[in-house]
């Protein structure tokens, strides 16, 4: 990612002289939406809403975005994709771009982008739904995997997208009481945001040690999110410190506690593995282009008992990383690996959908495969896997062949040569 943005800075600094940058700006339009670049809507039978939930007044609390089945309320507005300018600043820090420049660029290109989920729309009650906890990648945050989360919600899942506070997110925050707040002020008006930005490696610091420590915290945050949603479903009242019109009481008896899974991308893929090893209530897991460096030796030794699906891109993986995956999955028919042909590491987050061909290819946000086809393969394989291992009574088994790596633009296992090197 760092080398990618070295290239980015060179391009932007030469923007007045470069026909490429002028064309890229025209291609993207104002906010990306004017040229029809949109995050895809869910293809399932259910309308989707989303809302944010934060508990506690310290970094140890929980913060997540819940995607859920909603009543079909056409009057409700779609949700801003990136909700605060501080996320632009965090992305700039992560990508080694001056904050002032990065904030302006992100605001120009994606500032008006929305995700196709209705903000705080009324929850659709009536049955118990399976729950999926989602973990974001390094430098990401809770909102930028909305294409995957919305599709899962449209197919009947509750999806809790965690925002991690281990300093691996580009930016996140917690709410603390204002120093000058009055005792009679309500829960939301008497608080202010305390921002936590991405922490870079310090000089001489070993990355594996830092990432292993972070993945432990990330797994605990996924388990906290699970506990929080189950607490709400049990009817216990939870205080949301964010100002929201959403009525959490409507989620009472909404979770099928026997059908819970965990899913994540990159660093979030490692988080999936750690979460499975620590929490048996996660019945299965899906790791998207997992980055295995953070996974501890103890996890390999104790192994992961639950079913696990690795969905990899063609261009990101390397032999040592794949061999670590195979160490977890060897001789277990409930652990699968597939690779999406023509895909790149950024084929899973939303950035691939809000960039045009020039920006997308130059910054490796797009692969050779159409982004919509890549995400469909990912989502369909995931749904088929979840149906089997959560014992769902749906029709997702029509995509079972994808889990075995059979179909257009998908292969079983990996494209990486694993032959021993001399």
Swiss-Prot record:
SUPFAM superfamilies recorded for this chain?
alpha/beta-Hydrolases
Known catalytic reactions: a 1-O-alkyl-2-acetyl-sn-glycero-3-phosphocholine + H2O = a 1-O-alkyl-sn-glycero-3-phosphocholine + acetate + H(+)
Q: Give the annotated active site.
A: 266, 289, 345
Which InterPro entries has this protein been placed in? Answer: AB_hydrolase_fold, PAF_acetylhydro_eukaryote
Question: What does the record give as EC number?
Answer: 3.1.1.47
* Location relative to the cell: Secreted, Extracellular space
**Keyword Transmembrane included in the entry's annotation:** no
Keyword line: Glycoprotein, Hydrolase, Lipid degradation, Lipid metabolism, Secreted, Signal
Provide the tissue specificity. Answer: Plasma.
Organism superkingdom:
Eukaryota
Give the transmembrane ranges: none
Where is the major localization of this protein?
secreted
Q: From which residue to which does the signal peptide run?
A: 1-21
Q: What class of enzyme is it?
A: hydrolase
Its BP terms in the Gene Ontology are: lipid catabolic process
Q: Name one GO cellular component term.
A: extracellular region
Q: Pfam families from the entry?
A: PAF-AH_p_II (PF03403)
Secreted as a keyword? yes
Q: Which GO terms describe its molecular function?
A: 1-alkyl-2-acetylglycerophosphocholine esterase activity
Identify the glycosylated residues: 331
The protein's role, per its UniProt record: Modulates the action of platelet-activating factor (PAF) by hydrolyzing the sn-2 ester bond to yield the biologically inactive lyso-PAF. Has a specificity for substrates with a short residue at the sn-2 position. It is inactive against long-chain phospholipids.
Q: Which family does it belong to?
A: Belongs to the AB hydrolase superfamily. Lipase family.
* The protein, known as: Platelet-activating factor acetylhydrolase
């Amino acid at each position: 990612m760092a080398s990618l943005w070295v290239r980015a800075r060179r391009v932007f600094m030469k923007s007045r002289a470069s026909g490429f940058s002028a064309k890229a700006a025209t291609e993207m339009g104002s906010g990306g939406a004017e040229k029809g670049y949109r995050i895809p809507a869910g293809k399932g039978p259910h309308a989707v809403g989303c809302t944010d939930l934060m508990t506690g007044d310290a970094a140890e609390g929980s913060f997540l975005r819940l995607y859920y089945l909603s009543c079909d309320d056409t009057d409700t507005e779609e949700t801003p994709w990136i909700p605060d300018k501080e996320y632009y600043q965090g992305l700039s820090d992560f990508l080694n771009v001056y904050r002032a420049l990065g904030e302006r660029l992100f605001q120009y290109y994606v500032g008006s982008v929305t995700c196709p989920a209705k903000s705080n729309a009324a929850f659709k009650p009536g049955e118990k739904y399976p729950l999926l906890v989602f973990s974001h990648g390094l430098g990401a945050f809770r909102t930028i995997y909305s294409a995957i989360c919305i599709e899962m919600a449209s197919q009947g899942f509750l999806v809790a997208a965690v925002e991690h506070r281990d300093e691996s997110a580009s930016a996140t925050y917690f709410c603390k009481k204002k120093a000058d707040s009055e005792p009679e002020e309500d829960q939301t008006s008497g608080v202010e945001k305390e921002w936590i930005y991405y922490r870079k490696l310090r000089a001489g610091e070993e990355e594996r040690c830092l990432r292993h420590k972070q993945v432990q915290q990330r797994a605990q945050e996924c388990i906290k999110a699970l506990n929080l949603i189950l607490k709400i479903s049990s009817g216990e009242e939870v205080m949301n410190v964010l100002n929201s019109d959403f009525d959490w009481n409507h989620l009472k008896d909404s979770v099928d506690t026997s059908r819970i899974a965990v899913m994540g991308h990159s660093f979030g893929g490692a988080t999936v593995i750690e979460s499975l090893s620590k929490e048996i209530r996660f019945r299965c897991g899906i790791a998207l282009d997992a980055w295995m460096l953070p996974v501890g030796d103890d996890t390999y030794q104790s192994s992961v008992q639950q079913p696990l699906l690795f969905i990899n891109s063609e261009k990101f993986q390397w032999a040592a990383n794949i061999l670590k995956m195979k160490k977890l999955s060897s001789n277990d028919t409930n652990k699968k690996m597939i690779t999406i042909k023509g895909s790149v590491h950024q084929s899973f987050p939303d950035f691939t959908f809000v960039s045009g061909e020039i920006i997308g290819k130059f910054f490796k946000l797009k692969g050779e495969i159409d982004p919509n086809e890549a995400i469909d393969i990912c989502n369909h394989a995931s749904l088929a896997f979840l149906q089997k291992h959560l014992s769902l009574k749906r029709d997702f088994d029509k995509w079972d062949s994808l889990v075995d790596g059979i179909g257009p633009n998908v292969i079983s296992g990996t494209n990486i040569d694993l032959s021993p090197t001399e």
